[in-house]
Swiss-Prot record:
Listed transmembrane segments: 4-24
Protein name from the UniProt record: Cytochrome b6-f complex subunit 6
Organism: Physcomitrium patens
Family classification: Belongs to the PetL family.
Record gene name: petL
GO biological process: photosynthesis
Length: 31
């Protein structure tokens, strides 16, 4: 059970980080 929670936490963190990087690159291209 604990491993499943940690796995989903890691997956959510990775998706959030990717989204932040994607938005950051788009803002750099807009400037």
């Amino acid at each position: 059970m604990l491993t499943i929670i940690s796995y989903f936490g890691f997956l959510f963190g990775a998706l959030t980080l990717a989204l932040i990087l994607f938005i950051g690159l788009n803002k750099i291209q807009l400037i």
